[in-house]
Amino acid sequence: MKKWTIAASLSIGVLALSACNSDDEIVAETEAGNITKEEFYEELKDVNGESTLQQLVTVKVLEDNYEVTDEELEEEISTMKEGFPSEEDFNTTVEQQFGGEEQLREIMYVSMLQEKAAAEDVEITEEDLQELYERKNTEIQAQHILLENEEDVAEVQQKIEDGEDFGELAQEYSTDTGSAENGGDLGYFSAGSMVPEFEEAAFSLEAGEISDPVQSTHGTHIIKVNDVREKEESIGEFEDVKKELEREILLNRVDQTQIQEKINKLIQDAGVQINVEGMEDLFEAEETEENTTEEDAQG
């Protein structure tokens, strides 16, 4: 999203320049020669023009289909502030990472528009929310063995079935250097701490149970749960945290590729016409690329 902010800032400059009356207007003077508005505009267009225009059109199309209210944006910013020890810490971090709160608001605004587009195709039931709420009020203590190839998976599974010690197997086989030397011990954790595939498997186990192999972006896990207990401090009343739970489920179920495909479809349906010389086919190229990807997947 930072990229969008930079692009948007550049586009403001480009639009301001294009609004000037004369292409010969001087925007910079040097002893070596002057730089005209036209030269500056053409350079900005050549370097950042396509990405800037793509981002501006994307935001315009999203705004035509979805709405993020001032109240929603304020609530989001307030929630972020609660995660910092003080408002001064929040302001310092925001200044360092985003260039200021105004830039952060722009980023959050576009992010929330994208989330609304993604949420349209995802069904989240009351049961889903209740299940996540219960998990977040529960913590489990587990060990795991992370493996990289099928041969090791089969070998470790067999040794577990033969009764060998799980911790010793983790020390011998696990590629997770952070936990292997401790017998694969991950300590206590609650929902939202691990990758979704791992978490789903771990929270489905009772104390003392060992999972089947679980695939994640890190490799193949074999998980053993040793203890399940209620957290000492609740995350809050269900109705108070319901919106946060819904967002977490949404982000776990939708990846960036799916969001981009949805946005591309909205842009296609919006009948976008580009009137900048050299960029007339900007979104047609995106559409062709998307269709090619779909054909490759089907083939």
UniProtKB/Swiss-Prot annotation:
InterPro entries documented for this protein: Foldase_PrsA (IPR023059), PPIase_dom_sf (IPR046357), PPIase_PpiC (IPR000297), PPIase_PpiC_CS (IPR023058), PrsA_foldase (IPR050245), Trigger_fact/SurA_dom_sf (IPR027304)
A Pfam family per the record: Rotamase_3
Positions of N-palmitoyl cysteine lipidation: 20
UniProtKB keywords: Cell membrane, Isomerase, Lipoprotein, Membrane, Palmitate, Rotamase, Signal
Subcellular locations according to the entry: Cell membrane
EC number: 5.2.1.8
GO terms of biological process kind: protein folding
Signal peptide stretch: 1-19
Gene Ontology terms: cellular component: plasma membrane
Lipid-acceptor residues (S-diacylglycerol cysteine): 20
Topological type in the membrane: Lipid-anchor
Main location: membrane
Keyword Hydrolase applies: no
Catalytic activity: [protein]-peptidylproline (omega=180) = [protein]-peptidylproline (omega=0)
Top-level taxon in the UniProt lineage: Bacteria
A Gene Ontology molecular function term of the record: peptidyl-prolyl cis-trans isomerase activity
Main enzyme class: isomerase
Record has Hydrolase as a keyword: no
Family indicated by similarity: Belongs to the PrsA family.
Role this protein plays: Plays a major role in protein secretion by helping the post-translocational extracellular folding of several secreted proteins.
Name of the protein in its database record: Foldase protein PrsA
Organism, as annotated: Oceanobacillus iheyensis (strain DSM 14371 / CIP 107618 / JCM 11309 / KCTC 3954 / HTE831)
Designated gene of the protein: prsA
